[in-house]
Amino acid sequence: MALLTDLLNLDLSGSTEKIIAEYIWIGGSGMDLRSKARHLPGPVTHPSKLPKWNYDGSSTGQAPGEDSEVILYPQAILKDPFREGNNILVMCDCYTPRGEPIPTNKRYNAAKILSNPDVAKEEPWYGIEQEYTLLQKDINWPLGWPVGGFPGPQGPYYCGIGADKSFGRDIVDSHYKACLFGGVNISGINGEVMPGQWEFQVGPTVGISAGDQVWVARYILERITEIAGVVVTFDPKPIPGDWNGAGAHTNYSTESMRNDGGFKVIVDAVEKLKLKHKEHIAAYGEGNERRLTGKHETADINTSSWGVANRGASVRVGRETEQNGKGYFEDRRPASNMDPYVVTSMIAQTTILWKP
């Protein structure tokens, strides 16, 4: 008699050419990920070869009950680390039956901006540092924290090791390897300043693929925490008080910034961001005012500043970038719950397309 684990790990490649495709989309809150699976007659390597699909948008807060059908357009394919073999994860965006993007489809406008010829020729690179917090399932309290109590003050936890400093490493390492298997351009992980909080980095990725890959990496993380019986939150300030919040620092460069003379291009871009500070803050994640206080390695939400090697600034330029006269900058304002489609396209629009 086969056990449940045997069936979960069943290798289908020897018995059928069919594959399983897990279609992923963003739900009505703008942060909730949804997915469902279907089989296909054989391996698929490009999203244009995949069929569109549909779902009940009235059950995700994205359509009324009397006209509930929302259409999924496949946009990116990655390997499925849970089913393995030729099975795939499919990142989709969402449209009405008439082919119009629904309001929560932020990818559509992002793709328009990032495919603009003036943007495309600059080949924008993004490196996104996604922070998150692991919570004990039934009490919504950080992993490793005593129930109803607090751990010792911050200090020993950042990149810390040991059972009294590092909580959830099995989840984090599983996520790292699953992303690598799937084809996410994940570039690293580390424990964060607050215990129970972690970070993974995606990038450098070019253009719209940055958003696709961050969303799929989030999906993989939520699936792994589901298996582990742990909750992941992207709340930018999950614990009030003298504890670090959670951000999604976004590193960015263009071809002009990476070439000789690029430092001036960086300074000009950062000055543009200062002029659009309020608009960017409004789009950089909900609850960010609880995080951007001017404390805990953040700038105050009401001010816009930049500096070399300054982690208390809105935008940080690396010391190496200054020395080389070219490179990239880091926008430290985005919250952990930001939409990477919105943030990446908005930075490109402000720094490349906008003429003040």
From Swiss-Prot:
Homooctamer. Keywords: ATP-binding, Cytoplasm, Ligase, Nucleotide-binding. Signal peptide: none annotated. One of its GO terms (cellular component) is cytoplasm. This is Glutamine synthetase. The keyword Cytoplasm applies. One of its GO terms (biological process) is glutamine biosynthetic process. It catalyses: L-glutamate + NH4(+) + ATP = L-glutamine + ADP + phosphate + H(+). It is an enzyme of class 6 (ligase). It is found in: Cytoplasm. One of its GO terms (molecular function) is glutamine synthetase activity. Belongs to the glutamine synthetase family. In barley, there are distinct isozymes in the chloroplast, and cytoplasm. It holds the Pfam family Gln-synt_N. Its EC number is 6.3.1.2. Its main location: cytoplasm.
